[in-house]
Curated annotation (Swiss-Prot):
Keywords annotated in UniProt: Aminoacyl-tRNA synthetase, ATP-binding, Cytoplasm, Ligase, Metal-binding, Nucleotide-binding, Protein biosynthesis, Zinc
Pfam families, per the entry: Anticodon_1, tRNA-synt_1, zf-FPG_IleRS
Source organism per UniProt: Buchnera aphidicola subsp. Baizongia pistaciae (strain Bp)
Coiled-coil boundaries: none
Residue intervals passing through the bilayer: none
Protein name: Isoleucine--tRNA ligase
'KMSKS' region (motif): residue ranges: 603-607
Binding site for Zn(2+): C903, C906, C922, C925
Gene: ileS
């Protein structure tokens, strides 16, 4: 028998079946770098509508983690799809380069090297370390396939940027937003510095929960106020606290003016407790019987004092609205040094205080002999012992509760009153204006808007000063005695900032008061605090690089994309600064993505060992797999990743790659400049496929525009698996392989595949840039850009005429019918009736509507089902053993094995072959090899 393989148009391509992404991607990266791909894109898009994506700067510290990777990938997907949509996109990668993470790394190095250095030398080491981390992280981000202006990245430590940050701060001073005060702020005793709201995270903590008593001093006053007599029996106020270490700083005892309080008697004791709290408190104290003596409102007592249980002091009883009775006794001790509520309550009552601890969290030496230089958390046992020795401890137990922790050290923090600089959130109606601007922004997901509003409503004034070395300074002079600003502060700062722009932040620290102020140095001193890094990052929007290119945007970025934690962080700081200085929002849209968790929805942790490192995924599976996982996951929720997940995603990738490969392989020897078929001459199925691709493209572009990337993947997978894989590509194999090379039948098919492929490669480009770049090089034709990233969405796809009989609705019905036929064929295979569908002689028993639709295909119907013979009969003629469709009511199938001979060329079973020395193939194959060629109209 003759080998007919050479007479077939078999698929052929060098585009490999396996991606081998981890090996190929570095070569593709080099090609992009050699061609300066970002500059090429920028150059081509000059004059187009601009799109700005502002980059929330990560810390220049350590290797990137999976959260970093997700964030950069999401941003890159946006930039790439916006470029395909005809925008001139701007993306400048940014880094936070100052702050504690860098300081701690340098401090460890210094300690290890056992050397002493000056603060100036320390800053140099911090700068060098930060730069090295930027260099490393930049390579890691680029390895993800992220495009951006890497050569002009925004580093907060660049001299011009340091100057701009200081300049932005001085505008806040100028407009009256900044003030100095001595009040409690979040304080980390390990950082030895104040913390911003965004630097605090909450964890469950096991604490000592104690109930103690404070004896009324001169309790005759109480008896006179309540009972109008001068009875003198001892009375104790019962107080509950979970921070025993704050008791040495107690300056008052607070009751709520609106609560009812009971004076109760137990044996020989008289206690005052809130009425609601009595049963629970008595139960904890192990007291089963007590007598209610009197009930009174908190506001009905005044001018009372209590004796501190272990300090030789008396402190006043005050009224405060912040006192609650959900937990505890409805009475709290008040330490203004260690809490905002306590601070304001004491301030309202003109109660002054002095510090009891130092910046390291150690008690000062004048508080109590037992507490000298003791760490506050280690002092708890000592305090409880002092209470016990003084018969003041009524109950002690352990309690698990939510407690603030330092996000860097993962250790408990405190509120500590220190002299700090603050931004007044209520000045010039700033808080309400921020709320107004939030409502003008498009928030994705929508619930994040209310979250931001709630945070703005409840947030305190912003503490912007830090007691550290490596950071942008607060470049001002204050009076040595009064603390007031130098009268020429704004003018002086301009000169200082100009110096910083030339020489960096060290320029400020090199300045002496005498050299800069002359004789006034005796009256004024320079501030040595540095600015909160969140203020630094929040100032990016007002930086020079954005001022130059965003003039037509009024310095409003089109989009911010960051993790959930940035509501308190960068989203917040950017908003406050922009609202205060520019009277507008800094962003038009804000996307919040969730945190990464493992397959069990647990937060990733090195100690648990459930982390997934981007480098491991990239080195084994490739960046495109990580990008595909990112896009396929609903980022508005927690994003679960595991090895099992990545295996599943790899299956997605194979489906996408194999679809592209099939299309490409069947474009062998196809030249679009010469071989494209005019739409009016095309086979109807091919026109349907192009129309289907157009419908999918519209859905994909809409999903990109709505930032629903997981929907893009859903549409891609359905298109590859259903529309192409089990329908179109299966049906056209016979026509593509067996018809004549240059026939209308084949060129029509190739035209469809070419148009679909050139659209398809662009659909995947934002998500799979490495694969799309590789694929683009294999797509035939010279009338295209060198890189797919320079292209726009396809405009060559066209639709079927909805007025035609064989419109999309018609083909949708055929898709449903073919699905049911495939089930019947599979049933026949399982029952050993046939091995392959071409062995089938199929009879369909259908209603009149389906019969009419199928008969439109005439003799080509068998190609729809990939069988050798199809007959159509009335549904009522169906035998009892016919295969019944579960989806279509009036649809049954009988499948028998086709009697006949298998054509060695097309593999169809035919009843008769003209067999002589010249012909051993079917009539159709004779037409396609030595005849004029087979004619097709529908399939």
């Amino acid at each position: 028998m003759k080998d007919y393989k050479t007479t077939l148009n078999l698929p052929k391509t060098n585009f490999s079946m396996k991606g081998n992404l981890s090996k190929k991607e570095p070569f593709i990266l080099k090609k992009w770098n050699d061609n300066n791909i970002y500059s090429l894109i920028k150059k081509q898009n000059i004059g187009k509508k601009k799109f700005f994506l502002n980059d929330g700067p990560p810390y220049a510290n350590g290797n990137i983690h999976i959260g970093h990777a997700i964030n950069k990938i999401l941003k890159d997907i946006v930039i790439k799809f916006k470029t395909l949509s005809g925008f001139d996109t701007y993306y400048t990668p940014s880094w936070d380069c100052h702050g504690l993470p860098i300081e701690h790394k340098v401090e460890k190095t210094i300690k290890k090297e056992n050397i002493l250095i000056t603060k100036k030398e320390f800053r140099i080491k911090c700068r060098n370390y930060a730069q090295s981390q930027v260099n490393n992280q930049k390579l890691e981000f680029i390895r993800l396939g992220v495009f951006g202006d890497w050569e002009n990245s925004y580093l907060t430590m660049n001299f011009k940027n340091e100057a701009n940050i200081a300049r932005t701060l001085m505008k806040m001073f100028k407009y009256g937003y900044v003030y100095q005060d001595f009040k409690p702020v979040h304080w980390c005793i390990n950082c030895k510095s104040a913390l911003a709201e965004a630097e605090v995270e909450y964890h469950n903590k096991l604490s000592n929960s104690i109930i103690i008593k404070f004896k009324l001093a001169h309790n005759i006053n109480f008896w006179n106020q309540i009972f109008k007599n001068d009875h003198n029996q001892d009375i104790h106020l019962v107080v509950w606290t979970t921070t025993p270490w704050t008791l040495p700083a107690s300056q008052a005892i607070a009751l709520n003016p609106n609560f009812k309080y009971q004076l109760i008697q137990t044996n020989n004791n008289l206690f005052i407790i809130s009425e609601k709290s009595v049963p629970d408190t008595m139960n904890k104290m192990g007291i089963q019987k007590w007598k209610k003596i009197h009930i009174f409102l908190g506001k009905n007592i005044s001018n009372l004092k209590v004796i501190h249980p272990f300090l030789n002091t008396t402190i006043p009883v005050i009224l405060a609205d912040h006192v609650t009775q959900e937990l505890g006794t409805g009475i709290v001790h008040t330490a203004p040094e260690f809490g905002q509520d306590d601070y304001y309550a004491c301030k309202k009552n003109n109660i002054n205080f002095t510090p009891t601890i130092d910046k390291k969290g150690h008690f000062l030496n004048n508080i109590h002999p037992k507490l000298n230089n003791i760490n506050i958390f280690k002092s708890i046992k000592i305090v409880i012992k002092l209470l016990n020795n003084n018969n003041a401890l009524l109950h002690s137990e352990k309690l698990v509760h939510s407690y603030p922790y330092c996000w860097r050290h993962k250790t408990p923090i405190i509120s500590r009153a220190t002299q700090q600089w603050f931004i007044n959130i209520n000045h010039n109606n700033l808080r309400n204006r921020c709320i107004k601007y939030i409502q003008e922004v498009k928030w994705i997901p929508h619930w994040s808007k209310n979250r931001m509003i709630e945070m703005i409503i409840n947030r305190p004034d912003w503490c912007i000063s830090r007691q550290r070395t490596w950071g942008v300074p607060i470049p001002i002079f204050i009076h040595r005695k009064t603390g007031k600003l130098h009268p020429d502060t704004i003018k002086l700062s301009q000169k200082i900032i100009q110096n910083i722009e030339t020489n960096g932040i060290q320029a400020w620290f090199d300045i002496t008061e005498k050299s800069f102020l002359g004789e006034l140095f005796k009256q004024y001193k320079k501030v040595t605090d540095v600015i909160d890094v969140w203020f630094e990052s929040g100032s990016i929007q007002l930086s020079n690089i954005y001022n130059k290119i965003q003039h037509q945007h009024n310095n409003i970025s089109d989009l911010y994309i960051e993790g959930l934690d940035q509501h308190r962080g960068w989203f917040m700081s950017s908003l406050i600064i922009s609202a205060a200085i520019s009277n507008q929002t800094p962003y038009k849209k804000v996307i919040t993505h969730g945190f990464v968790v493992d397959k069990n929805k647990k937060k990733m942790s090195k100690s648990i060992g459930n982390t997934v490192h981007p480098s491991e995924v990239i080195n084994t599976l490739g960046s495109d797999i990580l990008r595909l996982w990112t896009a396929s996951t609903n980022y508005s929720k927690e994003m679960s990743i595991s090895q099992e997940t990545l295996i599943h995603i790899s299956d997605y990738y194979r489906r996408i790659r194999n679809t592209a490969r099939f299309l490409l392989a069947n474009l062998h020897e196809f030249n679009p400049e010469n071989d494209l078929i005019n739409a009016k001459n095309m086979i109807i199925l091919d026109k349907w496929a192009i129309g289907k691709a157009l419908h999918i493209q519209k859905k994909i572009i809409k999903s990109y525009k709505n930032y629903n990337f997981h929907d893009v993947i859903k549409y891609l997978m359905n298109f590859c698996s259903l529309d192409m894989g089990t329908f179109y590509l299966e049906i056209i194999k016979d026509r593509q392989y067996t018809t004549q090379k240059n026939s209308i039948a084949r060129r029509s098919c190739q035209t469809a595949m070419y148009l679909i492929l050139t659209a398809f490669v662009k659909w995947i480009t934002p998500i799979l840039p490495f694969t799309s770049d590789e694929l683009w090089e294999y797509i035939p034709g010279t009338n295209k850009n060198k890189f797919v990233f320079l292209e726009l969405w396809s405009n060559q796809l066209f639709d079927l005429n909805h007025k035609d009989t064989m419109n999309h609705e018609y083909w949708n019905q055929l898709l449903i019918i073919k699905t049911e036929v495939n089930k019947a064929l599979e049933h026949a295979r399982q029952n050993k009736i046939i091995r392959k569908s071409l062995e089938a002689h199929m009879t369909l028993y259908v209603n009149e509507t389906i019969k009419c639709n199928l008969k439109l295909l005439n003799k080509e119907l068998k190609f729809l089902f990939i069988t050798s013979k199809v007959e159509i009969k009335n549904f009522y003629e169906a035998p009892k053993d016919a295969f019944q469709s579960e989806t279509i009511t009036n649809f049954k199938t009988i499948i028998k094995k086709m009697n006949g001979i298998k054509c060695p060329r097309c593999w169809h079973i035919i009843t008769k072959i003209k067999n002589n020395k010249n012909h051993e193939i079917c009539k159709r194959c004779i037409l396609n090899t030595i005849g004029p060629g087979e004619l097709r109209q529908f399939l």
